[in-house]
Regions:
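C-terminal outer-membrane/trafficking sorting elements
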Residues: 452-542
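ATP/NTP phosphate-donor binding region
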Residues: 31-32, 36, 40-92
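Flexible gly/pro-rich beta->alpha loop and the following alpha-helix that scaffold active-site loops
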Residues: 85-132, 304
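C-terminal and late-domain segments of enzyme folds
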Residues: 16-45, 56-61, 149, 155-309, ...
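Sec-dependent N-terminal signal peptides
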Residues: 3-13
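Positively charged n-region of N-terminal signal peptides that target proteins for export
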Residues: 1-4, 541-542
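Catalytic nucleophile loop
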Residues: 102-104, 126-147, 304-317, 321-324
Length: 542
């Protein structure tokens, strides 16, 4: 049975409009883009839509919008310089539109030509009056509160990770700000940009104390965000990252980035995400819920895994094949899996992570591909001259740097058309020299106790009565808002009931469970909140 997150919508008092973010690559009549661009037309009330560019604006877009139901007055508009950007005629043309769409190109051209002009003002007027604003590629890049402006040119993930203060990392903070608290990146998967987005989010945290939401938009993908800031994925996939309460940051010039405990989602077509509350509303039809048993024990032996050796992938439980074949295997279905020697249980190991730019997409996606083949899993992304050592207790120690994607203990996972992997609620760590990570964290029940159980985010006061027949009540309190999950397991570790899987606000709660349909015995109540999990033992006596 599919599970859905319940959520609370906050009423927005402003008349702000809606937004369409497009990751790049070609739209087409009758293709993937019809649904999101049709949504754009609907948000514009089938009125006038103007597509704009600094360079020559495309006549294809208005024809496409009109074909999807927009008013026949829709048209393209080139705004090539500051003089034109301050034209009253252009301003009037734009403010009388129901939607404005910004084409791809170079975001620095847009920043230096339109920032602070009447074009800037007109876009805000349309949006604040309930209109729809959209952009693709560079047009997408300028819609967040924080803009990676590419003033000094672009950069790759390996450059960003090695030096978070690389001169090509530059921002504009006071341009359109259509999506507050958001930084976007386009062509995300096909250019392997995970490392640079993580680095840019880190820079904003380090330099300005900001907790921003990073949105990585894949090609042939649109993210359509309504007036309540609820976005739906169309096409392929988007990546969402943000800090958590446990995030640790070390970000200095000319040293590898350390940035831990980042929430990570890669969401597929049909997924729905609340960007204000940072909650997955609906995983969509392409991802299914997975969960590990409440108690699960693995054995480890002393081992060093070297990121310079491709053969290191054999130490994992799953090996992803096709990584070093065609550089587009991730996109066209050329990845596969085989079995490793399981020296590191539940692991997918990706060596030589940033060795060759053309294989960045294959290597990043292959880790997710391995997780989805049999979740939950850990992914070790290791570069040349990097390694990790694991002792017999499962404690991992990093040499130089390593990236770990932790998909435990549960979440949603699946493939789009059997090819592109999606996952929710994973945790991403960018570790550096001497950092440690306990691979056995999820394998031992953290506590089975009838007394008060505390964590950073919640407290279980009691399970009462206990023993019980047939009902008992779990009393708990929350220190922050989020999704609460409570499952009941029998003594064999089999999940027999999901008691709750809902959004809760901070406060005191009680939930009652009935053992009317099960036999006398010991039952375990597992409560999960954020990345913490606690278990309470109950005894049913009939």
């Amino acid at each position: 049975m599919r599970k859905f997150y319940l959520f609370y919508l906050m009423t927005h008092l402003s008349a702000q409009g809606s937004v369409m973010l497009v990751g790049g690559n070609a739209e087409s009549y009758g293709g993937w883009s019809d649904d999101p661009y049709g949504w754009f037309v609907q948000q514009a009330d089938s009125g006038k839509i103007v597509n704009i560019d600094v360079s020559e604006a495309s006549a294809w877009y208005p024809a496409y919008f009109i074909n999807l139901g927009a008013d026949s007055s829709s048209h393209e508009l080139q705004i090539p310089n500051i003089f034109s950007a301050n034209s009253q005629n252009i301003y009037h043309d734009l403010v009388t539109a129901n939607g404005i769409f910004i084409e791809g190109g170079d975001q620095w051209d847009y920043v230096q030509t339109w920032k602070g002009t009447l074009v800037d003002s007109a876009i805000h007027v349309v949006f604040n009056n309930g209109g729809v604003i959209g952009g693709t590629s560079a047009g997408l890049a300028i819609l967040g509160e924080i803009v990676f402006d590419a003033e000094n040119g672009s950069l790759t993930s390996d450059q960003a990770i090695a030096n978070p203060y690389h001169p090509r990392i530059s921002f504009t903070d006071d341009f359109l700000d259509i999506l507050s608290g958001v930084l976007t990146d386009s062509h995300f998967n096909d250019r392997g940009r995970l490392g640079r987005l993580v680095t840019m989010v880190a820079r904003r945290a380090q330099d300005h104390g900001e907790d921003i939401l990073g949105l990585g938009m894949g090609i042939k993908t649109a993210f359509c965000i309504d007036q309540d800031k609820i976005g739906t994925v169309y096409g392929k996939m988007i990546t969402v990252i943000h800090q958590t309460d446990d995030t640790e940051l070390y970000c200095v010039p000319a040293e590898p980035l350390r940035f831990t405990h980042l929430k990570f989602h890669q969401l597929l077509h049909g997924a729905v995400y609340d960007i204000d509350n940072r909650v997955l509303v609906d995983p969509g039809e392409n991802m299914s819920y997975y969960e590990m048993p409440y108690e699960y024990l693995n054995n480890y032996s002393d081992l060093t895994i070297n990121g310079s050796n491709q053969s290191s992938e054999n130490y994992g439980e799953i090996i992803v094949t096709g990584i070093t074949g065609d550089s587009d295997n991730w996109w066209y279905g050329g990845l596969g899996t085989t079995v490793g020697d399981t020296s590191v249980p539940d692991a997918v190991i990706i060596p030589k992570m940033w060795t060759d730019y053309y294989y960045f997409p294959n290597r990043i996606i292959s880790g997710l591909y391995g997780i989805v083949s049999d979740p939950p899993k850990f992914v070790f992304y290791l570069d040349d001259n990097c390694s990790v050592s694991i002792n017999e207790n499962g404690l991992m120690t990093v040499s130089n740097y390593a990236h770990i994607l932790d998909a435990f203990p549960d979440g949603y996972a699946g493939y789009l058309n059997g090819v592109l992997p999606g996952i929710s609620d994973a945790t991403l760590h960018y570790f550096t020299e001497s950092d440690t990570f306990d691979l056995s964290t999820y394998y031992i029940v953290e506590s089975i106790d009838d007394e008060l159980i505390n964590s950073n985010y919640f407290a279980i006061q009691s399970l009462y009565p206990n023993p019980f027949n047939p009902q008992t009540t779990l009393h708990f309190s929350l220190m922050k808002q989020g999704i609460v999950k409570v499952n009941v397991f029998n003594i064999r570790g089999e999940s027999i009931d999901e008691v709750v899987n809902e959004f809760h606000r901070p406060g005191e709660y009680s939930i009652t469970w009935s053992g009317e349909n099960v036999s006398t015995g010991i039952y375990y109540f597992k409560m999960k909140f954020e990345n913490e999990m606690k278990v309470v033992k109950g005894v049913l006596i009939k």
